[in-house]
Amino acid sequence: MEKLTKRQQDILDFIKLKVQEKGYPPSVREIGQAVGLASSSTVHGHLSRLEEKGYIRRDPTKPRAIEILGDNRTETQSVIQVPIIGKVTAGLPITAVESVEDHFPLPASIVAGADQVFMLRISGDSMIEAGIFDGDLVVVRQQQSAYNGEIVVALTEDNEATVKRFYKEKDHFRLQPENSSLEPIILKQVSVIGKVIGVYRDLH
């Protein structure tokens, strides 16, 4: 392979480090901050040189899609770009926004079926005792049924979306918050649209 400049080597090493730490590559902004480049276009230029020299491969249709090639010592994981769908409440229900706001890279090993998984941003504190906080992103596997006690994204009779623990009882459904100061939502009809299988929280 063609020799790299010091800046290109620094960028490649940073990408490898982040893939090793998180299982997916860093953003252009993160790369720029790490190597002292304020301009995203300059970072893109260095990434293009790395690609031309055969060190990485990029998919222009997907954000953060950087694959490390050739003689590298970092075992990369396959990454899936999971859609982030609107906002859903973890307090009082709000209308679900069924549109893709963004995509988030997750290791394929924890996501079975990219077309059946999405993420939602939590608004509210009704699930805090389950470790789900305001502003968190929950990873949701699309499914139309759930076992009692599972945390689900559900649509109420008024087509409002909410994240709660699901219980099917004798003549009704109970959507139970994980906050001891809040009351459950009791409904005759409810539609499960997915099961929460993970939570992502940005600690920065």
From Swiss-Prot:
| KW Hydrolase (keyword) present | yes
GO term, biological process aspect, one: DNA replication
Taxonomy, superkingdom: Bacteria
Q: Which CDD domains did the record assign?
A: HTH_ARSR (cd00090), S24_LexA-like (cd06529)
InterPro entries reported for this sequence:
ArsR-like_HTH (IPR011991), LexA (IPR006200), LexA-like (IPR039418), LexA/Signal_pep-like_sf (IPR036286), LexA_DNA-bd_dom (IPR006199), LexA_repressor (IPR050077), Peptidase_S24_LexA (IPR006197), Peptidase_S24_S26A/B/C (IPR015927)
The positions annotated as site (Cleavage) read A90, G91
SUPFAM superfamilies listed in its UniProt record: LexA/Signal peptidase, Winged helix' DNA-binding domain
* Signal peptide positions (record): none
Cite the Pfam families for this sequence.
Answer: LexA_DNA_bind, Peptidase_S24
User: What EC number is given for this enzyme?
Assistant: 3.4.21.88
Any one GO molecular-function label of the UniProt entry? DNA binding
- UniProt subunit comment: Homodimer.
From the Swiss-Prot or TrEMBL record, give the protein name.
LexA repressor
Q: Record the organism.
A: Bacillus mycoides (strain KBAB4) (Bacillus weihenstephanensis)
In the UniProt record, the gene name given for this protein reads lexA
